[in-house]
Structure formats: structure tokens, C-alpha cells
């Protein structure tokens, strides 16, 4: 006849065996969702911008004159976002920084292992790289790219739980696409830099960086809001970027224009 102690031990063994069986059956363990990719790189979770020095080639949206109407339409997102249920997850960019990137350049954060100019050592000071690039840009024989028209492309929107808020764009016509690609290829040669995003590049305007992962309800609301915003912008017509510049920056809030490209 089994003793009380034997019964307790047997039950303990059975529970342990059952736990082992559940683990072996492939029931997934709860995994912590990684934070958005730019947290700890460009922004803190508190939504404060981090130091993120570098250089780039961008075209800012024109805020006055012929560009006022399209800029004002983009600002509708800036106006409406604070009332959204997901708003506190995002770090809003100042409208003065709104731009379309033509070609990304060198970032200080890439110094250790990221993309770097093939003709420069990784201990080359960023200030010297900026000066070198500026000298090369000024010496180019090619005329400036000039104004480029873009169409808002709602079908390219990404509204996942860790996706930043941006306006996806595409060149308004074949001629504009060819001009943009020729300029990009020329600048790739100038910088002697190859970045992963150079291939299949998606033109866009960044509006806000996600600083915390969206939950399911927030993601649904985010997807719905972005779809509405982009549909309205697309229906309003092209967005024209009047000119592009070589720029330097210390963080994602402001870009110093140095020379038109």
C-alpha cells in the first residue's frame, strides 16, 4: 500500500513530466517583442532625439510660394496625429525638417561596422568627410537636378506594429524617374559609398519615428488613419520638391543645407 509520502512524490513527478511534455510538444514560449529599429539609435523611448550625426542629400519641402498648398496638406497629418490613440508612441518630426531623401550619406553610428566610404578609413573624422564631400560636390560639372514632382503612393505604405510614419512617394513620370536615378548614380560615385537601401529605394517623407511597439488595437487604428491620410494626399495631386542639397545634421530634427546638387 502506497504511503502518503509516495503519493506526494508521485504527483510531483507527474507534474514535472507533464511540464516537460508540454515543452517538448512545441508550445511557443512568450517572446518579448523587440523595440522599433530606431529606438536607441535615432530616438530614446521617451521620444527625445538622440545624437545621430551625418551627411545626406535631400530636398526639403517648400513651405511658401508654389509649394505652400501641398506642404499645408502634409501638415494635416501633423495637426491630426495628436488626437490618435497611438500618438504617444511616436516622436513627431518638426515640419521644418520635412524632406525627400535623394541619397543617404555617412552616419557616425555606422563608424564601427556599417557602410563606409571605400576610399576612407573608419577613423576619418566626420567633419573632414563633410568637408571632402562638399569640395567634391562643388567641383561637379553636372548641373543641379532641379525640381522633381512626386506622387503619393498609398499602396507602398507600411503600417506594422514597428513601422515609422512616412509618406511613400514615386516619381511623377518616367522622365523624372530617369533624372533622379542619374543623379543618384552620380552621387554614389562621388561618395564612394554603398548603403543597403540604395537598391530598390523607396522615396518618402518621414513624419514621425515610432518609439514603442503598437498593440493590436493601436495598429488597427494606425493602419486606418494612414490609409485615410495617404488617400487624401494622393487625390490632391503631385508634391514638388524644388531643389536638392548636400546637407549635414546632428540629429533628426534639423538639416543644414550646404550646396545644391
Predicted regions span which residues?
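Basic side chains
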Residues: 11-14, 184
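Histidine-dependent nucleotide/RNA phosphoesterase domain, centered on the 2H-phosphoesterase fold
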Residues: 32-261
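N-terminal secretory signal peptides
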Residues: 1-9, 20
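An N-terminally biased module of ancient metal coordination in phosphate/nucleic-acid-related enzymes
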Residues: 14-15, 100
Amino acid at each position: 500500500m502506497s504511503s502518503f509520502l509516495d503519493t506526494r512524490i508521485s504527483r510531483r513527478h507527474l507534474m514535472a513530466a507533464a511540464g516537460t511534455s508540454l515543452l517538448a510538444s512545441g508550445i511557443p514560449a512568450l517572446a518579448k517583442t523587440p523595440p522599433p529599429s530606431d529606438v536607441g539609435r535615432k530616438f530614446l523611448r521617451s521620444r527625445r532625439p538622440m545624437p545621430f550625426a551625418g551627411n545626406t542629400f535631400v530636398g526639403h519641402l517648400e513651405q511658401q510660394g508654389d509649394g505652400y498648398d501641398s506642404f499645408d496638406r502634409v501638415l494635416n497629418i501633423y495637426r491630426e496625429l495628436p488626437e490618435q490613440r497611438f500618438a504617444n508612441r511616436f516622436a513627431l518630426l518638426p515640419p521644418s525638417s520635412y524632406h525627400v531623401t535623394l541619397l543617404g550619406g555617412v552616419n557616425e553610428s555606422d563608424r564601427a561596422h556599417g557602410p563606409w566610404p571605400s576610399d576612407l578609413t573608419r577613423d576619418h573624422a566626420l567633419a573632414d568627410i563633410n568637408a571632402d564631400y562638399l569640395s567634391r560636390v562643388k567641383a561637379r560639372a553636372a548641373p543641379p537636378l532641379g525640381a522633381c514632382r512626386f506622387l503619393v503612393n498609398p499602396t507602398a505604405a507600411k503600417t506594422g506594429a514597428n513601422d515609422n510614419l512616412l509618406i511613400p512617394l514615386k516619381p511623377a513620370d518616367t522622365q523624372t524617374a530617369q533624372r533622379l536615378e542619374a543623379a543618384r548614380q552620380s552621387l554614389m560615385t562621388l561618395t564612394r559609398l554603398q548603403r543597403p537601401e540604395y537598391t530598390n529605394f523607396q522615396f518618402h517623407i518621414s513624419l514621425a519615428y515610432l518609439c514603442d511597439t503598437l498593440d493590436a488595437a493601436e495598429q488597427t487604428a494606425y493602419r486606418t488613419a494612414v490609409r485615410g491620410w495617404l488617400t487624401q494626399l494622393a487625390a490632391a495631386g503631385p508634391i514638388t520638391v524644388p531643389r536638392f542639397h548636400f546637407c549635414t545634421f546632428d540629429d533628426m530634427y534639423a538639416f543644414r543645407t550646404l550646396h545644391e546638387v
